[in-house]
Amino acid sequence: MLTGVTDGIFCCLLGTPPNAVGPLESVESSDGYTFVEVKPGRVLRVKHAGPAPASAAPPPLSASSDAAQGDLSGLVRCQRRITVYRNGRLLVENLGRAPRADLLHGQNGSGEPPAALEMELADPAGSDGRSAPGSGSGSGSGSGSGGRRRRARRPKRTIHIDCEKRITSCKGAQADVVLFFIHGVGGSLAIWKEQLDFFVRLGYEVVAPDLAGHGASSAPQVAAAYTFYALAEDMRAIFKRYAKKRNVLIGHSYGVSFCTFLAHEYPDLVHKVIMINGGGPTALEPSFCSIFNMPTCVLHCLSPCLAWSFLKAGFARQGAKEKQLLKEGNAFNVSSFVLRAMMSGQYWPEGDEVYHAELTVPVLLVHGMHDKFVPVEEDQRMAEILLLAFLKLIDEGSHMVMLECPETVNTLLHEFLLWEPEPSPKALPEPLPAPPEDKK
């Protein structure tokens, strides 16, 4: 009862309605949204739009290998060796030819990846999750106690990756393609409005959920409901419900972590990944010195200042247009309790450099150069550690680049969806010998 009264008071003070709790079963609402109960009492609002489903049942969530014999279009050989040393060093060796030379038109970046990349593993205890400042460019030169490091240079574990992937063009008319959009802390599916409308017009099937406590999803009043693992299981449930044969994950900020999680869990179903201002490939660890560790009542009193700070840091400009975008996108519009629980629940030690280096899915990284939350060095480091990665910088954008520059973002995303690499030389068949000439 006290919680309900408190929520009502907060609602009056903030001038926003409390998070709606949907029905206990999946139900289509009159405005085109679906309320999905991912577990008892935990209901997420989902925007599911696109072409009408085909009469045939979708393929099961399992690996499939239906490529026609002799068809080598988009076939790529993924080969790399990942070595973790006991002294905290990481060595990534690219043994094959990754299709980085086949860059998208207008792409920032250059040619082939280095044959080997060596870096220091980030210390989770000293990091602040994805929103923390960059921890360096990941060069191979370490500092201090070089001799002791060399003596301790013994492999702790070695991971070998050797597989073939078929990366094909994802077109809107293809019934086996689904685009998943996952927002970050404080947002809602409304931040994707321009992207959802754009891709639905092109014939794509799109799925965009509200995270728990955000938008119109249910908002449990228990902090444990907002840990990374709890939210990741929500996204797993949504993915398993709507996934088809070729699925593309698009994440923004904290939402990138859930895309990475799903790509790691379902490598045969995730066809491509797009990371927008997601940060570096470091394990998530909440900061104990963060302002979000203050009591909920204090955070509520500071909410006007936090909203203004988000506007200053999240947008390249702070005019009337940006304020309207912030309001329409329902960004940074959650209760103080949910905000505090979300920030303190960002604990994911498994999501380190090794975890990201194991991904074999092609990734497009989009970064707004005016972003004050995520330094460009973090996305550059992410591009270095991933096997198949393209980094695109948008000069006029910031953290909320999909709201600021929707046409540019839509074009980049669409080009990446249509991109298909040339087959790897190792995947090509040996040329047939020329027939002998007839002697006359």
Swiss-Prot record:
Stretches of Basic residues bias are at: 147-158
A GO biological-process term: negative regulation of NLRP3 inflammasome complex assembly
Q: What is its EC number?
A: 3.-.-.-
Q: Where is the composition biased (Low complexity)?
A: 124-134
Query: Gly residues bias: where?
Result: 135-146
Cellular component GO terms, alphabetical: cytoplasm; mitochondrion
Q: Where in the cell is it found?
A: Cytoplasm
Root EC class: hydrolase
- GO molecular function (one): carboxylic ester hydrolase activity
Q: Which UniProt keywords apply?
A: Cytoplasm, Hydrolase, Inflammatory response
A Pfam match: Abhydrolase_1
Q: Give residue ranges for domain AB hydrolase-1.
A: 178-280
List the active-site residues: 253, 371, 399
Region: Disordered; residue ranges are 123-158
What functional role does this protein have? Negatively regulates NLRP3-driven inflammation. Promotes NLRP3 degradation through the chaperone-mediated autophagy (CMA) pathway, hence attenuating inflammasome activation and IL1B secretion. Acts by recruiting palmitoyltransferase ZDHHC12 to NLRP3, facilitating NLRP3 palmitoylation and subsequent degradation.
| Subunit record text | Interacts with NLRP3 (via NACHT and LLR domains); this interaction is enhanced in the presence of NLRP3 inflammasome inducers, such as ATP, nigericin, silica, or alum. Interacts with ZDHHC12.
How is this protein named in the record?
Protein ABHD8
The gene name on file is ABHD8
